[in-house]
Amino acid sequence: MLALNLPPYSFKISNKEGKKYIFDVLRKKYVALTPEEWVRQHFTNYLLVHKGYPSGLLANEIQINLNGTKKRCDTVLYNRDLTARMIVEYKAPDVVITQAVFDQITRYNMVLRVEYLVVTNGINHYAVSYTHLTLPTK
């Protein structure tokens, strides 16, 4: 797999029926090794090992209901009272981060209303501090 702009780590890879799988420490199971999953596992490791977030406050593939449609946030970071604090959206390293990607994560944030949005393809990383504004009352 491609070298990323993230710290390297010792990952667990398995081969089954000609397909590669990588161990997801948050979901505690092997998942298909796709380019996007490669980015997810590296970024998750960065949050856990290098930034010190407890694994109990991170979750992968969190389902939300957006206007009657089921969607999945790639990774959600929670604070200690288990309120969502950050959404991370991953793309494969060869995917260019465009406005459409930010539109996607912003739609997810309409449901979770977090403080921080992160978008990464493993090469380029973007973090946004998000403030939820309300209209003034009379």
Model regions and ranges:
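Active-site metal-binding core of divalent-cation-utilizing nuclease and nuclease-like domains
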Residues: L2, G56-D81
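Alpha-helix C-cap/termination motif
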Residues: H50, R80, V111-L112, T134
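Short, charged, amphipathic alpha-helix that recurs within catalytic cores of restriction-modification
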Residues: T83-I87, K91-Y130
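Conserved small/polar residues in nucleotide/adenosyl-binding loops
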Residues: T131-T137
